[in-house]
Amino acid sequence: RISFYNAIKLICLFIICMTTFIAYANIQQPFSFDEIPTDLVPEYLRMELHGNSRITQRHQCRRLAHFLLWQLLKTAGKSTALLEQIYRTQSGRPQFSVDNIDFNISHSGDWVAVLLHINKSEKSAVGIDIEFSKKRSFSALMAHFAPQAEQEWFAKQLDEEQAFYRCWCLREAVLKSQGVGIVKLSSVMHLPEQLQIFSDYCSKGELLFTDELPFYFAAFINQSKIQPHFYQWNGKELEEKNIKKSLIYQVNE
C-alpha cells in the first residue's frame, strides 16, 4: 500500500513533470519587442509592415505572440534558444524541434494568447483558440458544423453567445493541436452535458473552457488533471491571474 506521504510525493512529481503556462495580451498595450535578441526573431517579424489596418493588425499580433512565447520560456525556466528551432509541419503548424515542449498561438481582434506546455515524460501536444465576442447569426453557424442533438441543446441555452463560443472554441482547440483546420469542425463530437469531446484529430487529454477572460478561451492539453498557470501582460511584465470558473472536458476518454 502507498503511504499518504508517498502519495503526496507522487502527485507533486506528476505536477512538476507537466507544466502549462498561458499568457495573453492586447496589441494596444506597450511591449518591448526589440528586447528579444535578434537571432531569436525570424526575419519576417523584424520588418515593419505598412498597409491596410487588417494587415498591420495581423503583423502586430504575430510580433506580440512571439514576444509572449519568449516571456513564457523565461518564466518556465526553459532556454529561449528554442525560438531559433521553430519549424512548420506539413500541415503548416509551427512547433519546436523537441517533442516534450509544445506551444500554440491564437489571436482574435487585438487580443493574443499563447500556451506553452512542458511534459518531461512524453510528447506534448496542445491547442488553443480565443474568440473576441462579435455579433453573429449563432444558430445559422451552429447548423453548419454541429449535429442535430447539439443544436437542440444550444437552442435551450439562456446565454446564446456563450454557448456558441463554447461549441466553436473547443473544436478549434482540439484540431489545432495537430494543425488541422476548421474544415474539420464538424468531425469533432461535442457532448456538452457530459463534458466530453471525441475527435480523430487529437490525442487523449483534457480541455479547459472559460469565459472569464476578455475573450472566450479554450485550451486542449494531452494530459489529465490539467492545472494551467494564467498570466496577463500588464504593459511591463507578466502578472499571474487566477481563473475562478471554467469547464473541464475529457477528450477521447
Short names for language-model regions:
Residues 1-17:
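Short, Lys/Arg-enriched N-terminal segments with co-localized hydrophobic residues
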Residues 14-253:
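Core catalytic alpha/beta fold that binds nucleotide/phospho-ligands
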